[in-house]
A protein has these predicted regions:
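Conserved non-cysteine loop/helix-boundary elements of the Radical SAM core domain that shape
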Residues: 1-121, 131-150
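Short glycine-enriched loops at secondary-structure junctions
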Residues: 125-130, 176
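Auxiliary Fe-S-binding modules of radical SAM enzymes
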Residues: 133-134, 140-225
């Protein structure tokens, strides 16, 4: 959002002002890049009702960010996060699993960094190979291996549980369904319209298996669904 021309940003925000004034809307949320954040601009959009800013961090590993050509670094994520928090705005940090040069260990480190940076919200997206992209070329040449559905579900379930334990709200798991991916655009990767439900099912399956394998026969557990 903050990468748009300032006039366009303001025009969008001005449309909402009457609704804010009447308490019909309590705040505005936007998503943007870490390298498109400045203290001055955050102050300005806060004045116009911005209450939540999500940053598309994707990873906090500089090697992963470089090879994915994200155009920002871990330091950019840290600086942008600090600016947002300094203005009392709720911080969200989005992450993506299965990126080139990524690993489950690096994914979990990204999750730890998201918690430590003070984010209160996150989104977990799996990396998908889309037609006519550089990632497709890497995939076709055997230089990139996409995550399977099962692997992505397993990783996402661990990340979700970690975020919940650390009071970080997970706003979404999995990509939005789109006509492009449903038709010719999809090449490879863990894309499924019910991806989030698969993750939650995996989490509950593990919880029940842990109960089943408990050493104490008289162990009583309350499970709230």
């Amino acid at each position: 959002f903050t990468g748009l021309p300032v006039k366009m940003q303001n025009d969008y925000l001005e449309i909402v002002q009457p609704y804010l004034d009447k308490n019909l809307v309590h705040g505005i949320r936007c998503s943007t890049r870490p390298d498109y954040i400045s203290l001055q601009r955050v102050k300005e959009i806060k004045h116009l009702g911005m209450r939540n800013i999500e940053l598309g961090a994707q990873s906090t590993n500089d090697k992963v960010l470089k090879h994915c050509k994200r155009g920002h670094t871990y330091d950019d994520i840290v600086e942008a996060s600090q600016i947002i928090l300094s203005e009392g705005i709720t911080l969200g940090l989005q992450m993506m699993i299965g990126l080139p040069y990524d690993s489950e260990e690096k994914d979990f480190q990204t999750a730890k960094d998201i918690v430590n940076l003070g984010a209160k919200e996150t989104r977990i997206y799996p990396c998908i190979v889309v037609k006519d992209t550089e990632l497709e070329a890497l995939y076709r040449n055997g230089d990139y291996k996409a995550l399977s559905i099962n692997e992505a579900v397993s990783r996402s379930s661990k990340l979700y549980s970690y975020f919940i334990e650390n009071q970080v709200k997970v706003l979404r798991i999995g990509l939005h369904q789109s006509d492009e991916l449903d038709k010719e655009g999809y090449v490879a990767g863990p894309y499924h319209k019910n991806f989030a439900e698969m993750v939650f099912s995996h989490i509950w399956k593990e919880k029940f298996e842990n109960l089943k394998n408990s050493e104490s026969e008289n162990l009583k557990k309350d499970i709230i669904i």
